[in-house]
């Protein structure tokens, strides 16, 4: 699995954030892929591949 860390952070648009408990990322530039495992863990998957690239934020539950 390839890890893809993003140097740019979008406040309020993290994967599994309070506004998107099902793992949706709207208007954040990462697509809107359904990632149920992203909620509560602070990580999600991009729209290119469900298991191709994992983006991790230690403060995703902001």
Swiss-Prot record:
Keyword hit for Repeat: yes
Keyword terms of this UniProt record: Keratin, Repeat
Keyword Repeat: yes
PANTHER family linked to this entry: KERATIN-ASSOCIATED PROTEIN 8-1 (PTHR36131:SF1)
Subunit and partners: Interacts with wool keratins.
Family: Belongs to the KRTAP type 8 family.
Taxonomic lineage from the root: Eukaryota, Metazoa, Chordata, Craniata, Vertebrata
Tissue expression from the record: Wool.
One Pfam assignment: KRTAP
This protein's name: Keratin-associated protein 8-1
Protein task: In the wool cortex, wool keratin intermediate filaments are embedded in an interfilamentous matrix, consisting of hair keratin-associated proteins (KRTAP), which are essential for the formation of a rigid and resistant wool shaft through their extensive disulfide bond cross-linking with abundant cysteine residues of wool keratins. The matrix proteins include the high-sulfur and high-glycine-tyrosine keratins.
GO cellular component entries: cytosol; intermediate filament
Native species: Ovis aries
Location of the region described as 12 X 2 AA repeats of G-[YCGS] in the Swiss-Prot/TrEMBL record: 12-53
